[in-house]
Amino acid sequence: MHPIIEIMSKKSIRFYKDHEVRAVWDEEKSTWWFSIVDIVGAITDSPNPRKYWSVLKTRLKKAGNELTTRCSQLKMAAADGKRYATDCFAQDDIIQLVRVIPSKKTEDFLDWFIYSDNTIDGQSKKKAYTLMESGLLDTLKPGTVKCLQQIHAFLFGGLYDFAGKIRTKTIAKGDTLFCLAEHLHNYLKTVESMPETTFDEIVEKYVEMNAAHPFMEGNGRSTRIWLDLILKKRLKMCVDWSKIDKREYLDAMVASHTDSTRIHELLKGALTDKIDDREIFMKGIDYSYYYEQND
């Protein structure tokens, strides 16, 4: 087994059917390393994936399988916020591991694992990481429509021909009808002029921008970054999105069209003053894109 590696330049959380899969980037080897225990839990639904992996690892060693010799231990953050040494494999070895674990989910998981980065969401998520590291966000004017358009253009440029462009068609999602296209221009001017001095004012502005839904696609991912920029500028705070359950968030956003109480509660409970913590923002991207995944 390789020695414990403590420092990695990038961290990522992927989600397979609501199962969290942690990963860290190895700059020297230009590869992602993935938590083995997370993947075992995702494809086996074992109540104790750590024990499952321990037994499997022993079995593989006894069988002379060289896979275990390529396992590295990396420091990864756990649910309690502390960092623990975690068995990890690089991508090719994860593929081999999954194929030796008996599971009906094998092919579905591999399809997700191998190809999800090539989807529009996968490509956009990479752009979001780059956006966070580029320094561009510091040049934008938080709370403005132009700021939101610039974020959207960066996230979806080259992926959608409407990246950064205000829609000219009326859209709906499920039973929710967003602002009619013919009223959108004036509606956005109204939202932009809304006050953003207090937390409650900022959340109301966010709720109204969600009701506007100014783009054909990619509204939520762009607007959550937009919200964090306002909070950072006005209150020296931001949202730790990993603290907000996906289903609760989505339900609260739907409800916010008539009653925004719950989204206020969720966002307030997830506020943090760690506005310069790179990991908070990167984790925020992971969860923001997870919110958009179909169940």
What are these regions (language model features)?
Residues 2-116:
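An anion-engaging/catalytic patch
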Residues 12, 96-295:
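FIC/Doc superfamily catalytic core
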